[in-house]
Amino acid sequence: MGVMSKYMRFREAGEAANVNNVAEYGEPARSLFTTSKFFSLHKGTDITDDAGNVLYHSASKFFSIHDKTDITDQDGNHVAHIERKVFTLHERHFITMADGRYFELSNELWHLIKDISNIEGLGWVLRGNIAGLNFQLYDQDDRIIAVISQKLFSIHDKYCVDIYQPEEEKTVVAILVTLQHMMKDREARNSSSSSFSSSSSSSSN
């Protein structure tokens, strides 16, 4: 359990914070959890607190080439708008917050084991471990903002985020939803590549 919890730090709502997160960063100020239902991000995602209360909701437009997504809070107020654009081999997501702040996330430096995304417009950095499905979000002064973890082998695409700078919660939620889409896009590309390789091998035989 200790070894697994070091690399796979996801936890369910109501469970204690991951021991390794606590050891490295202290107790989180707040934790949020996501569930995407019906096997598709386009059906919407609920972001809840430890008690299961829905605090935010994200919904994507059907058949949108730019994967347009809007996030609202529990009262229906607009929180953020996210759009994806593809430049050559790299995806870039543009996020506009309700307060007018604007920033970008790119998968340009994503690799198999260690991923780094510079968040242009904020000066923040998202550092990740794809193998362990964990990501750490740091501010411009290299202080921890949040730790994001994905549940392994979940049909409902579950994430947990431990927040250490609660004043940045809405921005963290926007980054969380964007990351969720980026991970889904990566899975889709890998699946397509595998299918193409299998098809090519069968044809050659």
Predicted regions: what is each one?
Residues 2-205:
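Intrinsically disordered, low-complexity proline/glycine-rich segments
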